[in-house]
Curated annotation (Swiss-Prot):
<keyword id="KW-0443">Lipid metabolism</keyword>
<dbReference type="GO" id="GO:0005524">
    <property type="term" value="F:ATP binding"/>
</dbReference>
<keyword id="KW-0067">ATP-binding</keyword>
<dbReference type="InterPro" id="IPR020845">
    <property type="entry name" value="AMP-binding_CS"/>
</dbReference>
<dbReference type="GO" id="GO:0016405">
    <property type="term" value="F:CoA-ligase activity"/>
</dbReference>
<keyword id="KW-0547">Nucleotide-binding</keyword>
<dbReference type="InterPro" id="IPR025110">
    <property type="entry name" value="AMP-bd_C"/>
</dbReference>
<dbReference type="GO" id="GO:0004321">
    <property type="term" value="F:fatty-acyl-CoA synthase activity"/>
</dbReference>
<protein>
    <recommendedName>
        <fullName>Long-chain-fatty-acid--CoA ligase FadD13</fullName>
        <ecNumber>6.2.1.3</ecNumber>
    </recommendedName>
</protein>
<comment type="pathway">
    <text>Lipid metabolism; fatty acid biosynthesis.</text>
</comment>
<dbReference type="GO" id="GO:0009274">
    <property type="term" value="C:peptidoglycan-based cell wall"/>
</dbReference>
<feature type="site" description="Important for substrate selectivity">
    <location>
        <position position="214"/>
    </location>
</feature>
<feature type="site" description="Membrane interaction">
    <location>
        <position position="195"/>
    </location>
</feature>
<dbReference type="GO" id="GO:0051701">
    <property type="term" value="P:biological process involved in interaction with host"/>
</dbReference>
<keyword id="KW-1003">Cell membrane</keyword>
<comment type="subunit">
    <text>Homodimer.</text>
</comment>
<dbReference type="GO" id="GO:0004467">
    <property type="term" value="F:long-chain fatty acid-CoA ligase activity"/>
</dbReference>
């Protein structure tokens, strides 16, 4: 039976002296043998708190070796980790604790004010029996035993519950099992060029699925994880050189920041091979900037529900297929579902995925779980197109698509054009009701109005987009509302600006 905690134990047996986790900012350096021992002590602490198989343990912590080992320790007990975004406000965290039925909450020092606010509520989460801060955890770990837990668990047993962003209401808890996480890590490790003793930089938060899966596949492949809890573009290149980093994880926005610092111009990092990125297509110009430094870029498309797996655009195709999310990873099928409900290998439609990497269910939401699947295919809610070579191009979210005069208009396509207008710093395109067309595309733009006007934006789009795709309305705003994970709240924008459209 596959158990993620057991995998760490096996790596500690095979490679006991190999560095597992390095955090230069705190001078933490831990081998796989040491990390496994710490995971066992974490399991002992959890057992003393009454945690048993199936119980939920909430982790409200920044990246740290303790986060990793609490996750592994819970896995060894058959308990279920609930990683929580440290940027969430008290009411949002409180909802997750209540919805997940978490029994123990372990939190870092920066989250203490949020925890205090939750505990001061008139009706705090009733299932929580213990609130463990960083100091209390450290004290308990000092006296904990490092023996391997003797618990039979793994396979289809729940491993973690991770809550989606919730742009349209309360977030849903995505349940992954030991099996789905093992499959996702295997899929990544079998698709990309990752080698034993590689050193991988992780500046992304572990409460997100891609980073958490990276932690796990690092143990699977015998990789050293270089952690950067607080991303700093001015320090990252020196860290890459000093720690002989081979691979880095980042989103396109971070990569754009990194190339603007002075250190990038003088960069000499012979060990570094490539970045893995996702969340948005990498601009072709940025790919070329990194290629000039002999740094390749691997891009991916994934969801929390697919445990960070889905498609990958390997570096050899980065320019030839610029704008694509790549092809399906190993052990994964990706297709499109047409309006007629037929699943097709090529063409345009809703992106669907079939694989062992998929979620088991949405926590306590059987109807949402049923609606998410079509004969084993997970419906992503994204609109995409798969070309004749099997490369996926994401068009937009299904729920955000605008139907104007009978034509499908994809906001993401318009946004990708408007962001190229000099002076524009942010943009969100939404559909607003229109008596003539049914809906029109409206662009909410954050820009310096001394540099750019509505007419300039429309004219710029007119040379790059079909006429029916042009924004019929441009609204300048000081800011665009986002949720704590940075996703634009288009429901808020639609509510805010619908009243401005003449009837």
């Amino acid at each position: 039976m596959k158990n993620i905690g057991w995998m760490l134990r096996q790596r500690a047996t095979v490679s006991p002296r190999l560095q597992a986790y390095v955090e230069p900012s705190t001078d933490v350096r831990m081998t796989y043998a040491q990390m496994n021992a710490l995971a066992n002590r974490c399991a002992d602490v959890l057992t003393a708190l009454g945690i048993a198989k199936g119980d939920r343990v909430a982790l409200l912590m920044p990246n740290s070796v303790e986060f990793c080992c609490l996750f592994y320790g819970a896995a060894k007990l058959g308990a279920v980790a609930v990683p929580i975004n440290t940027r969430l406000a008290a009411p949002e965290v409180s909802f997750i604790l209540s919805d997940s039925g978490s029994k123990v909450v372990i939190y870092g020092a920066p989250s203490a004010p949020v925890i205090d606010a939750i505990r001061a509520q008139a009706d705090p989460p009733g299932t929580v029996t213990d609130w463990i801060g960083a100091d209390s955890l450290a004290e308990r770990l000092r006296s904990a035993a490092a023996d391997e837990p003797a618990v039979e668990c793994g396979g289809d047993d729940n491993l973690f519950i991770m809550y989606t962003s919730g742009t349209t209401g309360h977030p849903k808890g995505v349940v992954h099992t030991h099996e789905s996480v093992h499959s996702a890590a295997s899929s990544w490790a079998s698709t990309i060029d990752v080698r034993y003793r590689d050193r991988l930089l992780l500046p992304l938060p572990m409460f997100h699925v891609a980073a958490l899966t990276t932690v796990i596949f690092s143990a699977m492949r015998g990789v050293t994880l270089i952690s950067m809890p607080q991303f700093d573009a001015t320090k990252v290149w020196s860290l890459i050189v000093e720690e002989r980093v081979c691979i880095g994880g980042a989103v396109p926005a971070i990569l754009n920041f990194m190339r603007q610092v002075p250190e990038f111009a003088e960069l000499d990092a012979p060990d570094f091979r490539y970045f893995i990125t996702g969340g948005a297509p990498m601009p072709e110009a940025l790919i070329k900037i990194y290629a000039a430094k002999n740094i390749e870029v691997v891009q991916g498309y994934a969801l929390t529900e697919s445990c960070g797996g889905g498609t990958l655009l390997l570096s050899e195709d980065a320019l030839r297929k610029a704008g694509s999310a790549g092809r399906a990873t190993m052990f994964t099928d990706v297709a499109v579902r047409g309006d007629d409900g037929v699943i097709r290998e090529h063409g345009e439609g809703e992106v669907v995925i079939k694989s062992d990497i998929l979620l088991k269910e949405y926590w306590n939401r059987p109807e949402a779980t049923r609606d998410a699947f079509d004969n084993g295919w997970f419906r992503t809610g994204d609109i995409g197109e798969i070309d004749d070579e099997g490369y996926l191009y994401i068009k937009d979210r299904l729920k955000d698509m605008i139907i104007s005069g009978g034509e499908n208009v994809y906001p993401a396509e318009i946004e990708s054009v408007i962001i190229g207008v000099p002076g524009v710093s942010e943009v969100a395109v939404i559909g607003l009701p229109d008596e003539k067309w049914g809906e029109i595309a409206a662009a909410i733009v954050v820009a310096d109005q001394n540099e750019v006007s509505e007419q300039q934006i429309v004219e710029y789009c007119g040379t790059r987009l079909a006429r029916y795709k042009l924004p019929k309305k441009v609204i300048f705003a000081e800011a665009i509302p986002r949720n704590p994970t940075g996703k634009i709240l288009k429901t808020v924008l639609r509510e805010q600006y619908s009243a401005t459209v003449p009837k």
